[in-house]
Amino acid sequence: MTTAANRPGAVLVITSSAAFLATLDLFIVNIAFPAISADFRDADFGQMSWILNSYTVVFAAVLALAGRLADRYGHRRVFLIGLAIFTIASAACALAPSLWPLVAARTVQGIGAALVTPTSLSLLLNAWPAERRAKAVGTWASVGAVAAALGPPLGGLLVAAGWQWVFLVNVPIGIVTMVAAARVLRESDAAPIGTPDLLGAAFLVLGVGSLAYALVEVPERGWGATVVLVAMVVAAFGVIAVVIRSRRHEVPALDLAVLRVPEFAIATAMMLAFSCGFAGMLLVNVLYLTSTWGWSAQAAGLGLAAGPAVVVVVARLAHRIAVRLGVGPVATLGALSFTAGSLWWLWQLGSSENYFRGLLPGQLLTGLGVGLILPTLSSVVGSALPGPRWGSGSSLLNTARQVGSALGIALVVTAVGTHIANSPTELASIRSGWALLAAAGATSALIGVALTAVEYRKNRTHTRSSDQERAPSHDCKHESPIIRTGLT
């Protein structure tokens, strides 16, 4: 592959800009919820949640295919197509006259973002030499982490000019990035693979979408409602169907073979669990500030800016720490910090305003967690998988991230939806949301311990093998040990 290998810095800027846009729109809309709700008064809280989940669900499903599409048709081509779709859909979101046209435009926007995310990483991996690749990926992932965390404060500033600007801001950045990409990036050679499993991707949409639908309907209908139970059954069918097809199809929607690499499989599970808590955090805190404390969208956005500031600093250092300690210990520390921040809010926050001693310390702790986890887990694609699997591995890891985000948003709606609609000052529902965040963080930490154990065992095996290679041998048939990935 020839991806402007002589201009790796330019490739890093272009791919990071695209990843910034795709990730930003996962979270920037949270802060615009009150303003959009004011314009679309006929929609209830559960319906409004589809402005978020239509994006994340489709994002997750198309991500599963994006790497394979890029392998078949060329990474540069798919990257540019995805960026164009995303930019046009952003403009359509701003022009939407009512809720469901906005949801439709967000769905298309999610398709574009899904095409951009894994191709940007694979273009980056192939532009940088192996010895500098981990640092480049760390920078790329850090930009995504910063974008995710900057969503609320940036959204708050943009909402002052109208909620449409949370979408319009993407248009000039998207156009500039497209022009630069067309001039700098070089096309890769298309791989002779079969047609990707579009039906499998549809089953993934069906499974995740039905589960999210069931969860957001619970506040209004209850767990025993027929529509909720049917949606749960459909969700189970969709998930089982995509797994079966992925095992049998020549070019599956989900490349499950990469999960045979223990480090990658565990990192993927940790990404799913943590993303559930992270996406839930960004939504529940906006709801808390705007409903319980009665802050404006602008004040809420600025009030949540401390966490992103921590992410900016920590994400830049996370790679260096992970090189010395390993991905597992760093990610586990991040999960514990995120859990501590969520528990701090449960302990300290109530109906009265308590920013500096209540909200702020929790932001600092959760920001530390986000900055440590997202960059380090993203780097596992390049460190644990062989080169030919980078595209599909990146797609699967990001699919887990978006599925986790969709479930986190749906669970927050389940926890707080009824009370937000009927009693804005009700704290019990908000506290349930914080408890959900703490549970997601604790689950992530437990998974991180497993990742640490696998890394430790692998490092011991590698050290022992290196010692054997250096030892004198009189056997002419000596064969150097190989650290196997399970994908050879």
What role is predicted for each listed range?
Residues 160-270, 277, 295, 302-305, ...:
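Hydrophobic transmembrane-helix bundles of small-molecule transporters
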Residues 45-46, 130-140, 297-298, 387-396:
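Loop-to-transmembrane helix entry/capping segments in MFS-fold secondary transporters
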Residues 32-61, 104, 298-302:
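Extracellular/periplasmic helix-loop-helix junction of adjacent transmembrane segments
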Residues 20, 50-57, 84, 138-146, ...:
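Transmembrane alpha-helical cores of Major Facilitator Superfamily
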